């Protein structure tokens, strides 16, 4: 098998709100959109994000009422503190403050208007706390 692209698809109530949140604050571009659907991409990301409106007929019946929950969109970034400051300046509410984990990850989280958790992270370099 050769994978040529990847995306995560999330069911939300307001597709436009989630799509706008990622385009405005995280630099995604809208690749395709239709009623109840938006596909987003970034030139430097190996994964796209697709938002589907909950209840959409095209979804399998047992998935129509599912809501994006229990998952985290995690993006590793080069300048974690800079991104934190930028998002705060843009008025984005930080829902988990910057913290360091024992396994070397540093991260903070925000939520989009539909409650989708977005985490920005980096990894501690040797000698960095």
What function would you assign to each model-found segment?
Residues 117-121:
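Structured catalytic cores of enzymes that bind and process phosphorylated ligands/cofactors
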Residues 1-6, 29-74, 84-111, 122-129:
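Vicinal oxygen chelate
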Residues 18-23, 87, 115:
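Conserved active-site tyrosine of GNAT-family acetyltransferases
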């Amino acid at each position: 098998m050769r994978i040529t692209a990847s995306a995560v698809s999330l069911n939300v109530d307001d597709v436009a709100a989630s799509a706008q949140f990622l385009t405005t604050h995280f630099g995604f571009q809208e690749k395709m959109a239709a009623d109840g659907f938006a596909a987003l991409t970034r030139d430097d990301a190996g994964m796209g994000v697709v938002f589907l409106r909950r209840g959409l007929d095209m979804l399998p019946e047992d998935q129509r009422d599912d809501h994006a929950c229990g998952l985290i969109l995690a993006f590793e970034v080069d300048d974690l503190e800079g991104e934190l400051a930028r998002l705060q300046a843009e008025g984005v509410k930080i829902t988990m403050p910057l913290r360091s984990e024992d396994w070397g990850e540093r991260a903070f989280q925000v939520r989009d208007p539909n409650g989708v958790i977005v985490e920005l992270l980096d990894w501690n370099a040797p000698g960095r706390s």
